[in-house]
């Protein structure tokens, strides 16, 4: 009897384990929702590093907590989802764009699906140039004013990788927050030229030159915004 009891207990345990695994072993989502944050179809150049977020809500479910998605510095995002109906929206107060016109986008995910997110930025960095002349870096750009009111500051960053933003730049960040200058360039078409920077005595700069990898990026920081709008990454060496 003891042997039969042990066998029965073992079989019961196996059945419980199998049942438990069956309940927990749901299929993983396989459809990819991808796209970019854009202005008139043009991808925005952003901070990256989880600074810009999108919220995705699935319709028809009791749980209303959003799926949080981070936007890369080139404006791209992606999320792995189940097929179904979703709502996509930017996070309020997050990103270098106006709240006006912020709206929910209805998305039907069926297999791999592409959906861009159109926004109205405060400013755009246009015709960005950064040049290296020996140990001196020069930088300039044009301003495109869209929904912005005032420019808080402008700056350029240098780094040894292509991932550069206001918080990640291992060579230098050069700010200009002169109020008079910011007022002068607060108009579409204005050209701004940074004061040339001499990096003869900058050890990280000299190391970057020896390694042959130096990248730069320019940023306009709108007044009142939680972050700036950027140029594309520029390779100087």
Q: Would you name each region that the model predicts?
A:
Residues 75, 81-98:
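A short, solvent-exposed beta-strand micro-motif common in secreted/extracellular proteins
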Residues 59-74:
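Short, acidic Ser/Thr/Gly-rich low-complexity loop/linker segments typical of extracellular
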Residues 42-62, 149-155:
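Short, ordered, surface-exposed loop/turn motifs in non-cytosolic proteins
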Residues 196-228:
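Beta-strand-rich modules
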Residues 31-41, 75:
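A short, amphipathic beta-strand motif
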Residues 16-20:
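C-terminal motif of bacterial Sec signal peptides marking the signal peptidase cleavage site
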Residues 93-122:
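Structured interaction patches on ligand/partner-binding surfaces of diverse proteins
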Residues 82-85, 190, 212:
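A glycine-anchored, Pro-Gly-centered beta-turn/N-cap motif
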């Amino acid at each position: 009897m003891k042997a039969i009891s042990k066998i029965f207990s073992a079989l019961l345990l196996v059945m419980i384990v199998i049942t438990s695994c069956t309940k927990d072993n749901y299929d993983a989502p396989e459809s990819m929702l991808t796209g970019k944050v854009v202005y008139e179809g043009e991808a925005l150049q952003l901070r990256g590093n989880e600074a810009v977020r999108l919220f995705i809500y699935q319709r028809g479910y009791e749980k209303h907590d959003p799926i949080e998605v981070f936007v890369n510095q080139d404006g791209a995002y992606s999320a792995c989802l189940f097929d179904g109906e979703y709502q996509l929206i930017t996070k309020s107060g997050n990103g270098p764009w106006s709240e006006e016109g912020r709206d929910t986008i209805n998305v039907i995910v069926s297999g791999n699906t592409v959906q861009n997110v159109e926004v109205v930025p405060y400013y755009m960095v246009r015709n960005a140039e950064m040049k290296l002349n020996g140990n001196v870096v020069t930088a300039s750009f044009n301003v495109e004013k869209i929904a912005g009111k005032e420019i808080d500051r402008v700056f350029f960053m240098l780094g040894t990788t292509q991932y550069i933003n206001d918080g990640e730049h291992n060579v230098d960040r050069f700010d200009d927050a002169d109020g008079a200058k910011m007022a002068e360039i607060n108009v579409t078409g204005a050209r701004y030229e940074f004061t040339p920077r001499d990096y003869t005595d900058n050890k990280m700069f000299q190391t970057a030159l020896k390694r042959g990898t130096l990248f730069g990026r320019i940023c306009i920081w709108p007044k009142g915004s939680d972050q700036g709008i950027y140029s594309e990454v520029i390779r100087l060496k």
